[in-house]
Amino acid sequence: MRLNTLSPAEGAKHSAKRLGRGIGSGLGKTGGRGHKGQKSRTGGGVRRGFEGGQMPLYRRLPKFGFTSMKAAVTAEVRLNDLAKVEGGVVTLESLKAANVITKDIQFVKIILAGEVKGAVVVRGLRVTKGAKAAIEAAGGSVEE
């Protein structure tokens, strides 16, 4: 094999459609745009959601709900991340110090994912039932 003999696999490359280059090409004259109408013109076409002047669906239907900003400052922490905290006492501040969560996080919930490496004391954090059972089984405790 030499560099000057390399070529793409058969059928891997498609030649571009050359529009408006004669009747024999199959794409001459109108170039696949049909006859007349807004979409046949240059720059023709309508914006997304436009329904020809009829009130569009996104405006016919009412607004609903909202986006909770609490979700942006809440994090889930896995059990195996608790091992990164030094001292064995897990609080919001100790998780931030260990770079398990970012500094803007205000609420944390510990979930049952991974395994607890040794006894830890969890203070002031929400904990799922399964995670609480796993922490207590490893000799740790959960304090509200």
Curated annotation (Swiss-Prot):
Pfam families reported for this sequence: Ribosomal_L27A
Region (Disordered): 1-53
Biological processes, Gene Ontology terms: translation
Cystine pairs: none
InterPro entries, sorted: Ribosomal_uL15 (IPR030878), Ribosomal_uL15/eL18 (IPR021131), Ribosomal_uL15/eL18_sf (IPR036227), Ribosomal_uL15_bac-type (IPR005749), Ribosomal_uL15_CS (IPR001196)
Record's GO cellular component terms: cytosolic large ribosomal subunit
GO molecular function: rRNA binding; structural constituent of ribosome
Keyword vocabulary terms for this entry: Ribonucleoprotein, Ribosomal protein, RNA-binding, rRNA-binding
Chain segments annotated as transmembrane: none
Family to which the UniProt record says this protein belongs: Belongs to the universal ribosomal protein uL15 family.
HAMAP family given in the database record: Ribosomal_uL15
Subunit structure, as described in the record: Part of the 50S ribosomal subunit.
NCBIfam families, per the entry: rplO_bact (TIGR01071)
Function according to Swiss-Prot or TrEMBL: Binds to the 23S rRNA.
Identification of the protein by name: Large ribosomal subunit protein uL15
Record lineage: Bacteria, Pseudomonadati, Pseudomonadota, Gammaproteobacteria, Pasteurellales
Gene: rplO
